[in-house]
Swiss-Prot record:
<dbReference type="InterPro" id="IPR005475">
    <property type="entry name" value="Transketolase-like_Pyr-bd"/>
</dbReference>
<keyword id="KW-0479">Metal-binding</keyword>
<feature type="binding site">
    <location>
        <position position="286"/>
    </location>
    <ligand>
        <name>thiamine diphosphate</name>
    </ligand>
</feature>
<keyword id="KW-0786">Thiamine pyrophosphate</keyword>
<dbReference type="InterPro" id="IPR029061">
    <property type="entry name" value="THDP-binding"/>
</dbReference>
<dbReference type="InterPro" id="IPR049557">
    <property type="entry name" value="Transketolase_CS"/>
</dbReference>
<dbReference type="InterPro" id="IPR005477">
    <property type="entry name" value="Dxylulose-5-P_synthase"/>
</dbReference>
<keyword id="KW-0460">Magnesium</keyword>
<feature type="binding site">
    <location>
        <begin position="114"/>
        <end position="116"/>
    </location>
    <ligand>
        <name>thiamine diphosphate</name>
    </ligand>
</feature>
<dbReference type="GO" id="GO:0019288">
    <property type="term" value="P:isopentenyl diphosphate biosynthetic process, methylerythritol 4-phosphate pathway"/>
</dbReference>
<comment type="similarity">
    <text>Belongs to the transketolase family. DXPS subfamily.</text>
</comment>
<feature type="binding site">
    <location>
        <position position="73"/>
    </location>
    <ligand>
        <name>thiamine diphosphate</name>
    </ligand>
</feature>
<feature type="binding site">
    <location>
        <position position="145"/>
    </location>
    <ligand>
        <name>Mg(2+)</name>
    </ligand>
</feature>
<dbReference type="GO" id="GO:0030976">
    <property type="term" value="F:thiamine pyrophosphate binding"/>
</dbReference>
<feature type="binding site">
    <location>
        <position position="175"/>
    </location>
    <ligand>
        <name>thiamine diphosphate</name>
    </ligand>
</feature>
<dbReference type="Pfam" id="PF13292">
    <property type="entry name" value="DXP_synthase_N"/>
</dbReference>
<dbReference type="Pfam" id="PF02780">
    <property type="entry name" value="Transketolase_C"/>
</dbReference>
Length: 642
């Protein structure tokens, strides 16, 4: 049995001698490289958090002491030492463990935090609850991968600092990066701390000297530490934290277990809020990750565990098409600028940044700021393009509504990973964007179906100069073209019955579901059911051409890869009522529930959003049986639509 196999709980880690910990860390590093190479996942961040996480579990008592990770993707080692090693064979796959903390998996996971910058607010609330209940429990917030660039962290710090007795230990896992190198004034400040370790040595020397004094040593040290303002400016560059009233320890080598344990033990003994600044290296111990200058293997597909090279050639994806077209637009229009919230590569802006570095802005994990900054740029005569994952748009809704749309500013927002993303689970599905966007007056939203329409609709979006535009597209591979047979009022007709056949059903297939809609129509044609398939192209507001076509059919069906509530079908139904178009409408979309991690195809199959299931439902509806039909594989999740 390996040392790692003997570890099934934090108590097992506590029992190990210091000499055994280095061996355990090495075994965990090999385990992560082997397992994540086979499944894909967040490899770099977790290789950099091994010793830090082991130290947390040796000093604190999870689950009695609450351990919260921010960002949640750096919690793999936490999962390993809390009894979930066997689950890594199916990491981020159906019936396997989540890539983020999961309350369903373990009592050690309090928070399913896969959106960044939230841990300190959770920690503040948990600590308040422990204080109110007179419970002697600590909260440990492990904050890393650029999360401190998010505004929520500073709102939380302001509250945590207000109570000198609040039992919160904040471990800053400072690897200098989110996906790419962390940017901004805070990043520069932390870099300065990394370069000036003298304060830690001075503080530790003073602690040892004073605590060795009989009787009064500990009290004297505590008093001097609390009143050290006269000397701290001479010794420490971390005034920002100390002036908030939060004690600071560091920088500490985050890969030195003994140093990390000492720092965490001191923080625990202090009582009250303490920051432990741990300096780590993303991808530590795996040469391919350390040598990956761009992202240090932040997130990988299936790779060779020796070389780090993907085992399969990467297909052309939606992000690639978007990235290339934005560069071409940038060459034609000097007023077009690009904004990202700490995701330059993942959102495809890396090529734009390389071509026009002075016109590309990475604002850190700060979607709210990004949106309002974009409004300001538009007021100044620029046309900003804010590239963001669909799931992170939720954070900037108020800014899009009040700062962009209310002022009718020409800002284009491009939503990558819209619809079902699959393996990252409930928090990363982009199924809420149309529900959010449909409530904003004056906004226009496009949903391309292929590479050709993505290029076309992106250009149409940046041509709008009197209000905000949005373009949504999914994760994954993209086909070059789903051809249209004609365009009517800006709406593409993708297929229709032969001239001598009657079209009974209008099938409006949104975005990437265009190809699926055509396949459904072909299947129904073989059964004698005439179907016209249209791609609305611009889904908000509802195109008049779709309404005109709806009035000429016996049944309207909408098909979309987003939430039903507030989706295109929902909006089309309202518009049909407004225009007194008395034709039945059935909307096939994602039900209003959180969806667990699985592949995109598996999730769509569960929801009945497959060619066979959709055709069967339409057949039943045409036959007059308009009651709900349970489809899918019996897991209890089905697309709504009756």
């Amino acid at each position: 049995m390996t040392l790692l196999e003997s570890v099934q709980s934090p108590a097992d880690v506590k029992r190990l001698e210091h000499g055994e910990l280095a061996k355990l860390a090495a075994e965990i590093r090999s385990f992560l490289i082997e397992k994540v190479s086979r499944t894909g996942g967040h490899l770099g961040p977790n290789l950099g958090a091994i010793e830090l996480t082991l130290a947390v579990h040796r000093v604190f008592d999870s689950p009695r002491d609450a351990v919260v990770f921010d960002t949640g993707h750096q919690a793999y080692v936490h999962k390993i030492v809390t009894g979930r090693q066997s689950g890594f064979d199916r990491l981020r796959k159906r019936d396997g463990i989540s890539g983020y903390p999961s309350r369903a998996e373990s009592e050690h996971d309090l928070v399913e935090n896969s959106h960044a910058s939230t841990a300190l607010s959770y920690a503040d609330g948990l600590a308040r609850a422990f204080q109110l209940g007179s419970e002697q429990r600590h909260v440990v917030a492990v904050v890393g991968d650029g999360a401190l660039t998010g505004g929520m962290c500073w709102e939380a710090l302001n509250n945590i600092a207000a109570d000198p007795d609040r039992p919160v230990v904040i471990v800053v896992n400072d690897n200098g990066r989110s996906y790419a190198p962390t940017i901004g004034g805070l990043a520069e400040h932390l870099a300065g701390l990394r370069l000036k370790p003298g304060y830690e040595r001075a503080l530790e020397s003073g602690r040892r000297t004073l605590q060795n004094l009989p009787v009064v040593g500990r009290s004297l040290y505590t008093g001097l530490h609390a009143a050290k303002s006269g000397i701290k400016d001479a010794l420490s560059p971390q005034v920002m934290f100390s002036d908030l009233g939060i004690k600071y320890l560091g920088p500490v080598d985050g890969h030195d277990l003994r140093s990390m344990e000492q720092a965490l033990s001191m923080a625990k003994a202090f009582g009250g809020p303490v920051i432990v600044h741990a300096v780590t290296r993303k991808g530590n111990g795996f040469a391919p990750a350390e040598n990956d200058v761009a992202e240090q293997m932040h997130q990988v597909k299936v790779i060779d565990p020796e070389t780090g090279i993907p085992t399969k050639p990467a297909p052309k994806i939606w992000t690639d098409v978007y990235s290339d077209e934005l560069v071409r637009i940038g060459a034609e229009r000097e007023d077009v600028v690009a904004i990202t919230a700490a995701m330059l590569g993942p959102t495809g802006l890396d090529k734009f940044a390389a071509a026009y570095p002075e016109r590309c802005y990475d604002v850190g994990i700060a979607e709210q700021h990004a949106m309002t900054s974009a409004a300001g740029m538009a007021m100044g005569g620029l046309h900003p393009v804010f590239a963001v994952y669909s799931t992170f748009l939720n954070r900037a809704f108020d800014q899009l509504l009040m700062d962009v749309a209310l002022h009718r500013q020409p800002v284009t927002v491009t939503l990558d990973r819209s619809g079902i993303t699959g393996d990252d689970g409930a928090s990363h599905n982009g199924m809420w964007d149309l529900s959010i966007l449909g409530a904003i007056p004056g906004i226009q939203v496009a949903a391309p179906r292929d590479a050709v329409t993505l290029r076309e609709e992106l250009r149409e979006a940046v041509a709008v100069d009197d209000g905000p535009t949005v373009m949504r597209f999914p994760k994954g591979s993209v086909i070059e073209e789903v051809p249209a047979v004609e365009r009517i009022g800006g709406v593409d007709v993708l297929s229709k019955p032969a001239s001598d056949e009657r079209s009974e059903v209008l099938l409006a297939a949104v975005g990437a579901f265009g190809q699926l809609g055509v396949a459904v129509a072909e299947r129904l044609a073989a059964q004698g059911i005439g179907v016209t398939v249209v791609d609305p192209r611009w889904v908000v507001p509802v195109p008049q051409a779709v309404l005109d076509l709806a009035a000429r059919h016996s049944l309207v069906v909408t098909l979309e890869d987003c939430g039903r509530h507030g989706g295109f079908g929902w909006s089309l139904a309202a518009a049909m009522r407004d225009q007194e178009i008395d034709v039945p409408l059935r909307d096939l979309a994602v039900p209003n529930r959180f969806l667990q991690h699985a592949s995109r195809d598996e999730v769509l199959s569960d929801l009945g959003l497959t060619e066979q299931d959709i055709a069967r439902r339409i057949t039943e509806w045409v036959a007059g049986r308009l009651t709900p039909v349970v489809v899918g594989n019996g897991r209890g999740e089905t697309a709504t639509g009756a």
